Amino acid sequence: MAYSQGGGKKKVCYYYDGDIGNYYYGQGHPMKPHRIRMTHNLLLNYGLYRKMEIYRPHKATAEEMTKYHSDEYIKFLRSIRPDNMSEYSKQMQRFNVGEDCPVFDGLFEFCQLSTGGSVAGAVKLNRQQTDMAVNWAGGLHHAKKSEASGFCYVNDIVLAILELLKYHQRVLYIDIDIHHGDGVEEAFYTTDRVMTVSFHKYGEYFPGTGDLRDIGAGKGKYYAVNFPMRDGIDDESYGQIFKPIISKVMEMYQPSAVVLQCGADSLSGDRLGCFNLTVKGHAKCVEVAKTFNLPLLMLGGGGYTIRNVARCWTYETAVALDCEIPNELPYNDYFEYFGPDFKLHISPSNMTNQNTPEYMEKIKQRLFENLRMLPHAPGVQMQAIPEDAVHEDSGDEDGEDPDKRISIRASDKRIACDEEFSDSEDEGEGGRRNVADHKKGAKKARIEEDKKETEDKKTDVKEEDKSKDNSGEKTDPKGAKSEQLSNP
């Protein structure tokens, strides 16, 4: 059994595919998968690879993705390419693809790799073959059942949680991205088997959801926790509320597995963000999550000043490994990005922290009141365990011929010019609209339409589990809390 007892060093599995950095959202788009490659290269040069098991993720199949997403949406993602977009204009509108979420070469393969790492990490945790699994290419928390959103197409987090639910009665999801984790909250809004806890900027900011009063519905009432924050939050303010809230959640909910989305756009100086956290302040959340000694899946997310994303996720990998690394950056393939200081840690800016101690205390107390409404954590039900998404011999071992990798075949047309990897502020106006009402009307209409189309598919996880147990069939978690809810 892999689980470490107490505060000892944990076994860590890390998922990375060398092709991930070649995918390119387009000129001026703030989302740059290249940041994953920068992170990987930096942690290699720190020598962290010696302390963990590194796996190349399998490419998640369409069948795996439709455990949550609609068949027609995944079929669309498989089919659309830059050279056939004109044939899909109606579907592009329906599935919200084309602006914030552009069509680019290898889009579906990018989704397969991002999802493959998260699902494989969940399987590894389920098998008790690791204490922690890390997939920095995952954490794409805005994707909906039948809609792309906020640079996210396939919700790898929801799919990984569905995998964890095969073995774990209760899963806790924590989101420290600056943007509300709306796609994950929406997927599990009506079940008590997943608690979602999101700390995010709220008010005239994408995606416009995550109000303090959004607490879940039906069986899921009080199982959605939202901490709305204002501009400029710093390490001290964040630390004063994060640990108490997560400790109270652990006490009241008693999950047996945790998923932590480590979006790095909550760092100071992020191109799209407005918080003032340092890498150390951000990583404190990883330290807190680790202290509970539960199976932990760590995922990426947002982060648009890419030199700082690489710093952050490298340091958080070291924190996962209980490994101290020097502030002086080692020479690496992207060394020039980290000038002029060439240090691992960043300083906060002098921006005003609009989160007063009174405001933070008031929100914390309101959330504590909600958490006190939770019933005592339900006991574990005995039930047949469904088949794992990744078989022992399929995704984890590197059995593919490296000469047949996608990068050899097609990376030339996916590699961006050097200046596209810069962090300059004048890079273009592309990207996420940080306004709450951006296309809200159209979105609501689409969600209502999807609601009608998928009504028959929607059932509660537990009811489905019971019926499957009675019939002796394999449990299919599709439809687990997949209610499409309009933005508040």
UniProtKB/Swiss-Prot annotation:
Ca(2+) 1 binds at residues 175, 177, 179, 198-199. It catalyses: N(6)-acetyl-L-lysyl-[histone] + H2O = L-lysyl-[histone] + acetate; N(6)-acetyl-L-lysyl-[protein] + H2O = L-lysyl-[protein] + acetate; N(6)-(2E)-butenoyl-L-lysyl-[protein] + H2O = (2E)-2-butenoate + L-lysyl-[protein]; N(6)-(2-hydroxyisobutanoyl)-L-lysyl-[protein] + H2O = 2-hydroxy-2-methylpropanoate + L-lysyl-[protein]. Residues 402-417, 429-481 have a biased composition (Basic and acidic residues). Ca(2+) 2 binds at residues 188, 191, 194, 223. GO terms for biological process: cardiac muscle cell development; cardiac muscle cell proliferation; cellular response to trichostatin A; chromatin organization; chromatin remodeling; circadian regulation of gene expression; dendrite development; embryonic digit morphogenesis. The keyword Lyase does not apply. The modification N6-acetyllysine is found at residues 75, 221. There is a cross-link at residues 75, 439, 452, 458, 462, 478, 481 (Glycyl lysine isopeptide (Lys-Gly) (interchain with G-Cter in SUMO2)). Keywords: Acetylation, Biological rhythms, Calcium, Chromatin regulator, Cytoplasm, Hydrolase, Isopeptide bond, Metal-binding, Nucleus, Phosphoprotein, Repressor, S-nitrosylation, Transcription, Transcription regulation, Ubl conjugation, Zinc. SUPFAM superfamilies: Arginase/deacetylase. Part of the core histone deacetylase (HDAC) complex composed of HDAC1, HDAC2, RBBP4 and RBBP7, the core complex associates with SIN3, SAP18 and SAP30 to form the SIN3 HDAC complex. Component of the nucleosome remodeling and deacetylase (NuRD) repressor complex, composed of core proteins MTA1, MTA2, MTA3, RBBP4, RBBP7, HDAC1, HDAC2, MBD2, MBD3, and peripherally associated proteins CDK2AP1, CDK2AP2, GATAD2A, GATAD2B, CHD3, CHD4 and CHD5. Belongs to the histone deacetylase family. HD type 1 subfamily. This is Histone deacetylase 2. It comes from Mus musculus.
